[in-house]
């Protein structure tokens, strides 16, 4: 069947392009010699014009995601891993963690406030933890802002974005849905956190190779879509599924 052959051709081209990319990186000229030519030949991912550090915000958060300070980035990743292991593998519950933290805090304050009497010293002021009044309001505003920005981004891709941007978003959402069906919410958050701390730095290091590979995939998709359109889609009558106007 022609449709089956087209699908097989698409899969075969994906494998061939990936193999060619690996072989070029191994046997081709050096990366620094080809950087200018590759940059001018391929479109950047999501048609961006600015460096990846600027796209990520350009501040301390971007430095952490791009591992500008390896100690801080590694500490953040290890902290997230410890939390995930604590809740997922050890089956520790959030309520238990909060209660134990409050218990340790109360014991520490009790010892601090009463130690001066046992040691015959002047009573020192016990430090207290007080959250700012606007803390939760600022957190809610920040979360709502990011959610609205994500929704606006997806809607712009669906209504105004080109085919490359749309396909990247569709593939990303499909992969997220597959991962979500196999893991719980905490594991999905951890996978997303690890991806956010590894994929940007890997993309920055292999930026031209990734952009070139994606550009070649889009070109292959366009060619196979034209074959599918001329061989199958164009034969479907345009008014077959339309509703007839009634006076």
Curated annotation (Swiss-Prot):
User: Would you tell me the Gene Ontology cellular component terms?
Assistant: cytosol; endoplasmic reticulum membrane; mitochondrion
Q: Which UniProt keywords apply?
A: Endoplasmic reticulum, Membrane, Transmembrane, Transmembrane helix
| Membrane-protein topology | Multi-pass membrane protein
Q: Does the keyword Transmembrane helix apply?
A: yes
Q: Which GO terms describe its biological process?
A: response to bacterium
Chief location category: endoplasmic reticulum
Report the locations given in the UniProt record: Endoplasmic reticulum membrane
Keyword Transmembrane attached: yes
Transmembrane ranges? 71-91, 92-112, 166-186
Write one Pfam family the protein is assigned to: Reticulon
InterPro entries to which the protein is assigned, alphabetical: Reticulon (IPR003388), Reticulon-like (IPR045064)
Q: Per the database record, which ranges form the Reticulon domain?
A: 61-247
Report the PANTHER family cross-referenced here.
RETICULON (PTHR10994), RETICULON-LIKE PROTEIN B8 (PTHR10994:SF62)
**What is the protein name given in its UniProt record?**
Reticulon-like protein B8
Give the species this sequence originates from: Arabidopsis thaliana (Mouse-ear cress)
